[in-house]
Structures are given as C-alpha cells and as structure tokens.
Amino acid sequence: KQRVEFLEDLLFTHRGLSGPAVLQISSYWQEGTPLAINLAPTVDLPAALAQAKARSRKLIANELATLVPSRLADTWAQREADWQRPINEATDKALARLAEQLARWELTPTGTEGYKKAEVTLGGIDTRALSQQTMECKTQPGLYFIGEVVDVTGWLGGYNFQWAWASAHACAQALPA
C-alpha cells in the first residue's frame, strides 16, 4: 500500500473538498480508500493547545481559531461536549483527543466530480513504447505521441504543460521537413 503526502491548501466547498491538496491526491486515490487529512500540518497541536490552556480562558473554539480557520474551529468544537468550554477548563485528555482528531481526520470520499470536471488525468501510452528522443512509437514507425496522451503525470504547478511542450518539441525536431 503506497503512502502519499502533500502539503497543499484544502478548500471546503458546497460540493465537498477541493483545492490543490485534493487535486494532487486524486491521482493516487482509489475508490473506497480512506484518506487521513492533517487539518493543521504546520502546527504542533498538542503543544499549542497546552500553551493556550495555561494562559487563556477563551472558549476552545476561539483558541482553535488562532490555529485553523475560524469556521473550521467552530464546527470542529461542536463535535464533542468536552470541547464546548473555556480551554482552561478542558481536561488534558480532551485536548489530546482534539489535537489527534485534527491531525488525523479520516474520511472516505464518496467519489469525484467525474471526467467532465477533471483537472488531473492518469494513464495513456506507456513511455517504454516510445523513443525518448523523438516520441515515435517503437512498434509503428511514423506514429508519434505527445503531451497528455502519454502516461506521464506531474504535480500541480505547470508540469503537465511543460511535458506537453517538451514532448511536442522533441517530436517536431524528429519529423521530416
């Protein structure tokens, strides 16, 4: 089982999860497979919550809103009665549970928006079937494949565009004048 991690933005929309993190993981996700999402990947949640408990009397949701978006903090704090109180009144066990759940939110997506809305595709002509220099099919001379029809997948950030341009250039250089 392959473990894949991304440190990218995550968007909550009216249709579900989206954003760069979802687009990245969609290349690897298999239907029915759960995902574990760290909702505060750059924060040491146990330490931050312990520090807040020692110095603050704010509601847990309000302290949490200094670490994650406020609407997420409000929604998350509503999940358990132990989290609906001032942070200095919370038990260490309740805060540890909160930190663990935020750092490892597990869910199983019910599906994708489908091919019509896809921004990431996988598959295509196996690169081993093509000349690396010309993109010509090894078994069918005169037949060339470039860009997204070839099984090359890059991370977000223009890599697929770069691959399309580079493979087109290699192919064009090889074509007879």
Model-identified regions with their sequence ranges:
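A glycine-rich dinucleotide-binding beta-alpha-beta segment and adjacent secondary-structure elements
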Residues: 74-153
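Tryptophan-centered motif/residue detector
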Residues: 29, 105, 115, 163-165
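An anion/pyrophosphate-binding glycine-rich loop and adjacent beta-alpha core
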Residues: 1-93
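Short, intrinsically disordered/low-complexity patches at protein termini
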Residues: 44-45, 109, 168-170
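A conserved FAD-binding loop/helix module that cradles the flavin
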Residues: 152-177
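Gly/Ser/Thr-rich beta-alpha loop segments that engage phosphate groups in nucleotides
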Residues: 18-21, 125-126, 149, 156-160
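Short, surface-exposed linear patches
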Residues: 33-35, 56-61, 124-125, 132-133, ...
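N-terminal low-complexity, intrinsically disordered patches enriched in charged
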Residues: 25-28, 132-133, 167, 177
